Amino acid sequence: MMERKPLPIGIEDFKEVIDSGYYFVDKTLMIKDLIVNKVKVGLFTRPRRFGKTLNMSMIQRFFEKTDESNAYLFDGLKISEYPECMQYQGQYPVISISLKSMKQATFEEAFAVFKDLIRAEILRHKSVLFQNDAIEKTDLDRDRKSVV
C-alpha cells in the first residue's frame, strides 16, 4: 500500500511543501500561462482557503533570482516539461505582496501595514536596486519617500 503524503494545511511556502514531501496538486502550468500571456502584473482573487498564497509562493520561487537555485523544486512537475518556460526560472527579482494580513480596523492602520509590506519588499531587493546603474540613488530616495 502506498504511503499517504500529509496535507499541507496552513503551509504557505512552496519550498516547504516540496522539501517536506507534502501532498501537492501541480498547478505549475499557471506559470506557463503567465509566460505565454506576457503578464507583467498579476492580481489573484479567489475565496479564502483556495491556495492563493501558496500559488504566489510557487510563482515567486520559480521566477526569483536567489543565491541558491530553486530549480530542483520544479523537477517532475508539469512546468519542467516546457524548456521554453524553464529558461525563465531564477532570472528575476520578484515583488510579492499578500494582503491576507490586512485586517485592520481603520484605513490609517491598514495603510501603515501596507507601507510596511512595501518597505519589506524594498529592503529584500535592496542589493538589486542599488547595483543597477540605470536606477539613480536619488530616484530611489524620492520613490522611497513617497511610499514609506
Tell what function each PLM region has.
Residues 10, 15, 64-129:
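P-loop NTPase motor core
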Residues 1-81:
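Walker A/P-loop-proximal flanking segment of P-loop NTPase domains
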Residues 147-148:
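Conserved small/polar residues in nucleotide/adenosyl-binding loops
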Residues 127-139:
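Short, glycine/acidic-rich hinge or "gate" loops at secondary-structure transitions
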